[in-house]
């Protein structure tokens, strides 16, 4: 006896909506013990059953009876009525009732066919990997062609021919999709098979080569920028010790100054000697540059050129060298000023016992002491003048007394 269509539709609707409702045991157990977040998430996924279930059949049926609904037809003889038992109208938005559907019973048996209305994720993954390999191969060929003959336009990747996939890995679309493929659209990459790791594997070779070219240009324009900044950073944290190639055959250079520790320069260095060494180094640099421009074939000039290139790679290194020399001279000047203030403090009698006198106090006391010394000098001059006059008067009196005795 044939089951009516309305009863069959109601039974299938109840079967499809059965997973949307939880049983009494699940409901009461969930109220007593709240589910973990993972269980709650999976239950939410179960509320949306996609795709519709395949028609049930007994395992003892023959191969020809696996699709009984495809052979059942209504009074009008259209096979589209049999698919309306399995899916609603909303599930088949692209089915055209004017186009005749395919009959799966007449299709040849294929080993890789899927006995369901969904694509197999494994076969889709294999097809996607083959497509990615061919895409990379075409991208490499396109990159080599573009490197040989550069062009300004951007070309889209060509479509991969179907012959490169192989017939053993493909599935007959007519065995899976019973309606025409001209009105359907199947996107393998939006069906959940694309993962972040798979998307990261796709690399555009042309853009990578452009990036390498741009990085190479930047590195060639300023090759010693990082080294110069590193030298600046090291000058603030440790004594100045720049390792250069060496002096030019016994002649002094700035490397001899920079290699000396700061404490040694403070104690033993002289300001005039440092200035003379700097002037000699500048003369050596200018003479080596002129000789390098005049005669390039000479071995001595080539060696001096190498030394200059190694010791002065860029303008930044020259600035740091000049700044280091200036700092050495400035420290020497401050040290001399400090020693002069200490000597002045020792000369003032009021500040002889004060070890921590300020510079302003030292200057004030020194000016007062100098003014007092000048007043005392003036009084002493006056006393000296009076003493000279008295001495002169005494001599005249002595001469007057001795004059009658001589006669």
UniProtKB/Swiss-Prot annotation:
UniProt keyword Ion transport present: no
Compositionally skewed regions (Low complexity) per UniProt: 285-306
Location in or out of the cell: Nucleus
Domain bHLH: 321-373
Keywords, comma-separated and alphabetical: Activator, DNA-binding, Nucleus, Transcription, Transcription regulation
Domain of life: Eukaryota
GO MF annotations, alphabetized: DNA binding; DNA-binding transcription factor activity, RNA polymerase II-specific; protein dimerization activity
UniProt-annotated stretches for the region Leucine-zipper: 380-401
Family matches, as PROSITE patterns: BHLH
Pfam families: HLH, Myc_N
Recorded GO CC terms: nucleus
Region listing for Disordered, in residue ranges: 1-92, 134-155, 284-323
CDD domains registered for this protein in UniProt: bHLHzip_Myc (cd11400)
Acidic residues composition bias: residue spans: 1-16
Compositional bias (Basic and acidic residues): 58-74, 134-144
Purpose of the protein: Transcription factor that binds DNA in a non-specific manner, yet also specifically recognizes the core sequence 5'-CAC[GA]TG-3'. Activates the transcription of growth-related genes.
Subunit (UniProt): Efficient DNA binding requires dimerization with another bHLH protein.
Protein name according to UniProt: Myc protein
């Amino acid at each position: 006896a044939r089951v009516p269509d309305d009863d069959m539709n109601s039974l299938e609707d109840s079967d499809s909506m059965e997973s949307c409702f939880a049983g009494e045991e699940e409901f009461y157990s969930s109220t007593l013990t709240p589910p973990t977040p993972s269980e709650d998430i999976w239950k939410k996924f179960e509320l949306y059953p996609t795709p519709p279930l395949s028609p049930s059949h007994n395992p003892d049926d023959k191969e020809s009876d696996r699709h009984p609904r495809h052979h059942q037809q209504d009074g009008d003889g259209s096979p589209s009525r049999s698919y309306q038992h399995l899916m609603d109208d909303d599930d088949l938005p692209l089915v055209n009732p004017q186009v005749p559907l395919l009959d799966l019973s007449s299709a040849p048996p294929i080993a890789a066919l899927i006995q369901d209305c969904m694509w197999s994720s494994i076969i889709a993954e294999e097809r996607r990997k083959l497509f990615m390999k061919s895409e990379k191969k075409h991208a490499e060929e396109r990159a080599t062609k573009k490197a040989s003959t550069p062009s300004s336009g951007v070309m889209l990747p060509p479509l991969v021919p179907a012959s490169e996939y192989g017939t053993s890995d493909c599935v007959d679309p007519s065995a899976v999709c019973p309606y025409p493929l001209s009105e359907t659209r199947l996107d393998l990459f939006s069906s959940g098979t694309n993962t972040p790791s798979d998307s990261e594997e796709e690399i555009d070779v042309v853009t990578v080569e452009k990036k390498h070219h741009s990085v190479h240009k930047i590195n060639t324009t300023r090759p010693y920028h990082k080294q110069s900044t590193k030298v600046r950073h090291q000058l603030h944290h440790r004594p100045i010790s720049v390792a250069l190639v060496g002096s030019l055959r016994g002649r002094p250079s700035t490397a001899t100054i920079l290699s000396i520790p700061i404490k040694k320069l403070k104690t033993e260095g002289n300001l005039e000697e440092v200035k003379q060494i700097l002037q000699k180094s500048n003369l050596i640099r200018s003479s080596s540059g002129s000789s390098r421009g005049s005669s390039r074939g000479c071995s001595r000039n080539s060696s001096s050129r190498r030394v200059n290139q190694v010791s002065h790679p860029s303008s930044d290194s020259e600035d740091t060298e000049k700044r280091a020399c200036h700092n050495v001279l400035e420290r020497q000047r401050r040290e001399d000023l400090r020693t002069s203030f200490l000597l002045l403090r020792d000369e003032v009698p009021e500040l002889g016992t004060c070890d921590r006198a300020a510079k302003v106090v030292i200057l004030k006391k020194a000016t007062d002491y100098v003014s007092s010394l000048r007043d005392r000098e003036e009084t002493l001059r006056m006393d000296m003048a009076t003493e000279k006059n008295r001495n002169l008067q005494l001599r005249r009196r002595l001469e007057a007394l001795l004059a009658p005795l001589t006669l």
